[in-house]
Amino acid sequence: MAKGSIGVTTSNIFPVIKQFLYSDHEIFLREIVSNAVDATQKLKTLANAGEFKGKTDDLKVSVKLDTEAGTLTVSDNGIGMTAEEIDKYINQIAFSGAEDFLNKFKDNANAIIGHFGLGFYSAFMVSKKVEIHTLSYKEGAKAMKWTCDGSPEYDMEDCEKAERGTDIVMYIDDEEKEYLEKNRISALLNKYCRFMPVPVIFGKEQEWKDGKYVDTDTDKVINNIEPLWTRTPTELKDEDYIKFYHAIQPGQEDPLFWIHLNVDFPFTLTGILYFPKIKNNLDVRKDRIQLYCNQVFVTDSVEGVVPDFMMLLQGVIDSPDIPLNVSRSYLQADRNVKKISTYITKKVAARLEELSKKDTKAFEEKWNDIKIFIEYGMLSDEKFCEQAMKFALVSDTEGQFFKLDDYKKLIEGNQTDKDGNLVYLYATDKEAQYSYIKAANDKGYNVLMMDGQLDIPFVSMLEQKNEKSRFVRVDSDVIDNLIRKEDDKKSELSADEQAMASTLFKSQIPAIEKSEFYVSFAALAATDQPVVITQSEYMRRMKEMAQFQSGMNFYGELPNAYNLTLNTNHPVVKKVIEAANSSLEGELKPVNDELKATNSVIEAIKSLDKDGKGVPEDKKADLKTNEDKATELRAKKDELISKYAAGNDTVKQLIDIALLGNGLLKGEALSNFLKRSVSLL
């Protein structure tokens, strides 16, 4: 028997492993099984080189539990090891030193195991003792047994072993008894080893017999040694891809389409990415794409390997150029990983462009299911955006689809304003904004539908990329103001009449929570609506963008600001003003006369300010007295007009019709409108 100390530069590696890898200790099984698979693959390589003459068609890895002995054993029939190889690969562990080791990896637990060839030692995370029973493939080799109880000391001696290969026998620690449970081991094997390239056996197949499941004599192979991504795309059918999709994403609808990745230069990468029906569900989950290294599961947290927007997809990526054990920060900084990320982005964009050209109709039918993915990509990845500008679609209120360039050509002849700006009109709710859409259509304008979750930031992005272009929601102003074709029409209301109208209508707008209303005027055609409610494009968009950008919370807290726009050329509006003037003439005349006289006094006093330093001291009191008087007179005038308006059903009806058209008339105000409508019949 040989005794010795493990050649490490720290006095005891095992407390280090247990301390810093405790949170990830389940990966020991992946490491031990991966080593076993490597041993079988190396034997196959030797056979191909003519250095091994035996059979290689029965290579396998077995995992066995012995709850009575408290052991978990991983066995392979690979190359095995000689005493010298045990000494080299197990006993002599070299790395840079304890202090550097701890400082570098204490925050990156998963980066330790495997990074310095320590995969075997991960067994000590869950074991109080580990044995190696091994017999090398080399002719005349002796079977060896190596034993270590977690201290730097080990024993090595000859043993009896009939078959070539290695058994790793782990005596599970009392605190880690979960790794003696069949279901726990089965779950870990399914997670980490389900696609390993060599059969992995755990337990027996079962059959239903005498009212219960019983073991058969057939070994249960838990993995698929030739997963779909390792096969040539030309030999696969659609049903193969769909079947594999449901194997890795059970319970999901069939995918829309997929991309089979296959590249071997300047890096090696295979995989399959599936496009599910995303629709308006911006759920960026971190576990939909699984990352493998030579068919060994690494992680399903692929930030850094693929751009964020790609995490809306599902599937697998396999690359030996991504280290098996890495931290997230390592992934994000690795040069190969960055190249892989760029390649995947380019490949996905190319596939989408190909689909859009190959069958335009089919691509349009899928658009609403993938729209949010493409918009998210265009908003977050500039390179993807450049490619996507060629195939991204927009749709109008009639349900027609257009590529961005095609739509620009469609509208630039008719929707360019007098200043040369191309105006894109859009709606977010076809039913609620029907009257505004119709007003635009009546002018011969086309209106886009922008009702998706990311459409508002998408609109802002398109504005930035297209000079002399702007997007405006169709209800943000009257249509003639949205696309100005000529100078303003002449208003048929005087300034005094507009002032009267402003008070008449503003005084009767019902109070609506978190909303403010302003009265404005537009000289429209007599056949246009008499009263229209609009919402400023700028303020509304700022509030909407506040949902996406934390720095814009200020806008999100502001009340909704609406304009009650009166058509100064509409006969009903003019009739209301004429009736008010006629009815209030006797009451308003003395107030107006006194206000006019007071304003004259104010102007006379202000004219005494010759040098811009203010009125003379002896006139300041007179100025304030008259300004206060003017304020009182204006308030009295507004009170008279408001009192008149309160009894005028036409004013209220015009306001309520406009509110109703915007979905703003509710509760008591809606009930009053209905009663008034009946009484006016």
Q: Positions of the model-derived regions?
A:
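GHKL (Bergerat-fold) ATPase N-terminal catalytic module, capturing the glycine-rich phosphate-binding loop
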Residues: M1-L180, A187, T342, K589-N599, ...
